Amino acid sequence: MSEECTHDCSNCGAACSSRDAAPQHDAPNPNSSVKKVIGVVSGKGGVGKSMTSALLACAMARRGYHCGILDADITGPSIPKLFGIHGRAMADEKGCWPIQSRMGIDVMSINLLVENEEDPVVWRGPVIAGAVKQFWTDVVWKDVDFLFVDMPPGTGDVPLTVFQSLPVDGIVVVASPQELVSMIVAKAVNMAEMMKVPMLGIVENMSYVVCPDCGKHINVFGDSHVDEVAAKHHLSVLAKCPIDPQLASLSDAGLIETYPGQYLEGAADACEKLLKK
């Protein structure tokens, strides 16, 4: 394989060993049972990707599905904090066991394995990617309908590892309203196409804020460009989520499961359709 390989055989004439090879995903823990794997990605940080992962898992749990969240953001884990989970994950001869949230959502994160959750994880890329892979191969995801993989921003080692190692059934892209989103979303879409992973659609976060006095929607970051970006890439806009102080407060308190907003129902519908295919 060439060092310049993009993993997209359709535009390559080289007769390398990867051509026409079926994807070789890593086998999960033998005690695991996962029906669908959903990757939640973003082209840059700070757009609310982890919050979207958490709320989407909550939305599916309310529909009666058993959900799990694999926190693949090793150097910036936030999923346990959102759910108010501060314990240590336990392991036995079957593997490492995720910790369940109040709603029964299985959570695995590097913060559940370190001595102090405030200790930084200072690892190089290959070690980080290896840890994410072990969250799939060593953790027992028992009878999970939807496993949401909260990935770090960008298109680096971890997303590549996830797409190559896990049987990802669909990707949700989280973006913000700024015009810059066009280029950022394009990068995520192009990577998904290279790895032959289907896109479920785009979630626009921080889309607007609701005036507490008159109820008017105020576009804090200017006019949204998500519809034109979605149309350009033939994608659906799954949700437009507002800036909500209540959500911020509940997240800080580890009570995200009690948030009453239902802005991600469209994204939940897209995930649910995967089970019916």
Task: Place the predicted regions along the sequence by residue.
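Short glycine/serine/threonine-rich phosphate/pyrophosphate-binding segments
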Residues: 49-54, 77-80, 151-159, 181-184
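C-terminal lobe/tail of nucleotide-utilizing enzymes
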Residues: 1-25, 189-277
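Walker A/P-loop phosphate-binding motif and the immediately C-terminal alpha-helix
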Residues: 31, 36-74, 189
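Glycine-rich phosphate-binding loops of nucleotide-dependent enzymes
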Residues: 108, 151, 164, 200, ...
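Conserved Switch II/interswitch segment of TRAFAC-class P-loop GTPases
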Residues: 142-149, 155-156, 167-188
